[in-house]
A protein has these predicted regions:
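Short alpha-helix boundary/capping motifs
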Residues: 44-46, 84, 253-254
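Long, charge-rich, low-complexity alpha-helical segments
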Residues: 202-257
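Conserved SAM/AdoMet-binding glycine-rich loop
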Residues: 1-64, 69-77, 88-100, 106-109
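C-terminal accessory regions of radical SAM enzymes
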Residues: 77-204
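Generic amphipathic alpha-helical segments used as scaffolds and interaction surfaces in large
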Residues: 8, 73, 152-155, 198, ...
């Protein structure tokens, strides 16, 4: 069956959905930009969106989602950060599309457009075709509206986001299916990475492997990673040992925080 859910589900909750027969979920991910998620009042962080995708795929649940743009206050930096991040997510299910924000009646954007830098310009494009009488005020009956914002985004960044999302979809329909998997031995972890068109094998040992394993199941703070190291070595870890391992994994695109 199909259900709509929030994207802040835990691994255990997603496993329960799978065991209960859920085949498709729509978690309303819509962005990997923290500022855009805050603007939407989603109550989630980009990392929670990533984890929802990860565990849904792990438990065999299809996930339907889209990337939304066109929010008031969005910046070029928001687009650049999101583009850079989604290039690291090619092993996860791609979005159905990149679409623009839909402005609806009764929403905060409709009720207080000036507060958000929005100017409502017309009713939705379909209304004049459906209600063609000249006596009907489409602005009074419409539920969705055309609008512009004071935000100016670099058109090349928009195009790059569209192209990156399209490449993501094409990769999942090709013979070169992207993947990111790992195997765990006693003293090391081997990561097999084909998110790009190049296959890469990365061997992680010591602190790098410990940090990788520590963060695999759920998000961890630096303090929690240090505690994990302490259990491994039986004493307080050296200064910056955890931080250096985290930095290495982030550089390789294996850790996000």
């Amino acid at each position: 069956f199909f259900i709509e859910v929030k994207s802040n589900l835990t691994k255990k909750q997603i496993k329960t959905l799978a065991q209960g027969g859920a085949k498709v979920i729509q978690p309303g991910i819509e962005s990997f930009s923290m500022s855009q998620l805050q603007e939407m009042d989603k109550g989630v962080r980009p990392l929670q969106n990533i984890l929802c995708m990860k565990w849904a795929m792990y438990y065999g649940i299809e996930i339907n989602w889209n990337i939304l743009i066109g929010f008031p206050g969005e910046t070029n930096d928001d687009f650049r950060q999101q583009i850079n991040l989604i290039k690291l997510l090619f092993h996860l299910p791609p979005p159905e599309c990149v679409g623009s924000l839909w402005l609806e009646r009764f929403s905060p954007y409709f009720q207080r457009p000036e507060e958000y830098g929005i100017k409502i310009t017309a009713p939705g494009e379909a209304y004049p075709f459906v209600y063609d009488s000249p006596n009907i005020d489409h602005l009074k009956i419409a539920y969705d509206f055309e609008f512009v914002t004071t935000t100016q985004i670099d058109p090349q960044l928009k195009q790059e986001l569209f192209q990156t999302a399209e490449e993501w979809k094409e990769r999942h329909q090709s013979e070169q299916l992207p993947y990111l998997i790992f195997t765990k031995a006693m003293d090391f972890v081997t990561v097999y990475d084909q998110r790009s068109l190049e296959s890469i094998k990365i061997r992680l040992e010591g602190p790098q492997a410990w940090a990788f394993i520590c963060c695999n199941e759920a998000p961890k703070s630096v303090g929690q990673i240090r505690d994990f190291f302490r259990e491994k070595i039986g004493k307080d870890p050296e200064d910056n040992l955890a931080e250096n391992a985290i930095a290495y994994l982030e550089e390789k695109g294996l850790l996000y925080g």
